[in-house]
Curated annotation (Swiss-Prot):
EC number: 7.1.1.-
Keywords attached to this entry: 4Fe-4S, Cell inner membrane, Cell membrane, Iron, Iron-sulfur, Membrane, Metal-binding, NAD, Quinone, Translocase, Transport, Ubiquinone
Gene that produces this protein: nuoB
Subunit structure: NDH-1 is composed of 14 different subunits. Subunits NuoB, C, D, E, F, and G constitute the peripheral sector of the complex.
Origin species: Phenylobacterium zucineum (strain HLK1)
Protein name stated in the entry: NADH-quinone oxidoreductase subunit B
Principal cellular location given in the protein's record: membrane
Length: 193
């Protein structure tokens, strides 16, 4: 069997047949024209970046959240906004309207009667939109799991991006969840093609 050397062509999966790539090659990083232009602009004090990278960077630093506080987890969410933890220093500011927010924090027990309202508010949010499920009740029903009226996790109603465990989770856990969401946005981007 032939050993692989750097620079050998690698066959792309059948869905993209006919194209080959070279290991370690990234067109953004290795385009000679882009490198030349980038170097000339850097000498003049400018920074070059792809537009989608710039938009993703800006979006992670200006996430607007709205609360869907249903129970005691909302108290910890309020504490995370106070001066000790101050979520706004991460660019995570509260908004009252779903039409102005990017992130919904579902905190507390979601019951069957409230599920349609949650979905309606989620549908009013502009794209791209993200959901943080905060606490055991929002994650999977929690203490009220066996109740006839409890939805066993808000992910049955809306798609969830980050789960914050705990009963109730601490403000530090929510801050960590926000940082994880920002990492996810940086990793996946926001532009759909």
């Amino acid at each position: 069997m032939e050993e692989r050397r750097p620079g050998m062509g690698v066959i792309v999966p059948a869905g993209e047949a006919g194209r080959t790539t070279v290991e370690g090659y990234d067109p953004k990083l290795h385009d000679p024209y882009f490198d030349g232009v980038s170097q000339r602009l850097a000498d003049k004090g400018f920074v070059t970046a792809a537009a989608d990278d710039l938009i993703t960077w800006a979006r992670t630093g200006s996430l607007m959240w709205m609360t869907f506080g249903l129970a005691c987890c909302a108290v910890e969410m309020m504490q995370a906004s106070m001066p000790r933890y101050d979520l706004e220093r991460y660019g995570f500011a509260p908004r009252a309207s779903p039409r102005q927010s990017d992130v919904m924090i579902v905190a507390g027990t979601l019951v069957n009667k409230m599920a349609p309202a949650l979905r309606k508010v989620y549908d009013q949010m502009p794209e791209p939109r993200y959901v943080i499920s905060m606490g055991s009740c929002a994650n999977g029903g929690g203490y009220y799991y066996f109740s006839y009226s409890t939805v066993r996790g808000c992910d049955r109603v809306v798609p969830v991006d980050v789960y914050v465990p705990g009963c109730p989770p601490t403000a530090e856990a929510l801050v960590y969840g926000v940082l994880q969401l920002q990492k996810k946005i940086r990793r996946t981007g926001t532009i759909v093609r």
